[in-house]
Amino acid sequence: MLRAACIVIWLASPSIGQDFYTLKGHGGPIMDIAVSPLGEISTASFDNAVGFWGTDGPVWLEGHRAAVNTVCFLNNKIIASGADDFTLWVWSLESASGRMVAAHTAKIADVAIAPDGQTLATASWDNKIGLTHIEGLDGSVESWLVDDMILLSGHRAGVNAIAFTQDGQTLYSASMDGTIRSWNLNDPKAPSTVIVKHGFGVNRLIVNDADGWLAYGAADGGTRMVDLNTGETIADFTLGRRPVLSMAYDPVTKMLAIGDGQGYIMFIDTTVRRITTDFKASLTGPIWALSYSPDGEYIHAGGIEDIVYSWPVAVMDKHIPMVGGIQSFLEDPISLPNGERQFKRKCSICHSLTKSSARKAGPSLYGLFGRKAGTVVDYTYSDTLSGSSIVWSEESVNALFDLGPDHFIPGTKMPMQRIVKKHDRDDLIDYLGTNTVQEEN
């Protein structure tokens, strides 16, 4: 479950002041970034893995069966992650092992650790918030004592974000139902209190109870600070860019960072409630992940690329934006033959055509035709495909996209998508037939 690889590329050491650097190695977009008190970085990716970026390069924590959406440090030695497979995993960096400790009935969008260092909160698209208490984290993974998850109900749509107060007595949650709620954790069965009624879905949430405010970002681009007790707006930083997808706060500098769907990172000085920098960080897509270094000098960001970018905050407007190259699924479709276009738009984000699966969310398609499903050696399959009798052929690939993966292979973790037009399926199959042929020895 824990595998090391030396494929990180540093443009500059993070110890050198005011230098920009990147972390490379994931096989899919970066969905979340967390930073330990020591400054070490963990990442959640569309490639189904959690990355831990230590001094010797990346270590991959593998156990999730779908895209990982969220990650957090419980301490310098323990990481938690939540994913599209509905599960919450906790990982020990010391023992090189992990364990699934709880599960929702829909994707987990956010995870947060309480000040006690033992209680994890999870935000899920099943409209619920989960509280999972774990004791014995200083022992082996097998010896951890995990309580049954307590579920908090009240939201009428999926929950996107959660945050504890510093005393751990209150939890705040943001939902697609357009509300932000507070929960009294001394009485989990008590009804929640609606603090904000935004209307549009609220995606991200930062709580600063020491200064008496919370900040949130919404699907319509709404970006506001509100009074923590009354919910009254005390500052509005909405610029019309939507949606807001990521937020990070640094308690040292009191700077708030907001990432959006148009590739900008906006910085706000919360002491004077003023925008200080508005940086076009990505030329090709959204900013899904943001996190500060412990001293507040660096902002780490992730998006549609499989790279983490780290900029020095003080001079980041003098640095270049994300320039990792155009991802294959973003290439101009007009410039491509139809079969290649279908592959790059529908398949390339998850699958490679090389011998290696290249750390992507799905197995390599090299040697696809004539191969039994579930047999690529460098990929971890779901139980559904591990024992499948399907042999990939023109007929089975056609059926896969005609019916949709969820109907052709019930229980698969493949995305639910169809290629409706027969000529598009035919062109894709022709393209795969030409580009997945194994080389003769």
List PLM regions with ranges:
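Extracytoplasmic electron-transfer domains, predominantly the class I c-type cytochrome c fold
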Residues: 359, 363-415, 428, 432
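Residue-level detector of Asp-centered blade-edge/turn motifs that repeat once per structural unit
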Residues: 35-38, 74-76, 115-116, 166-167, ...
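Electrostatic cytochrome c docking/interface patches
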Residues: 315-342
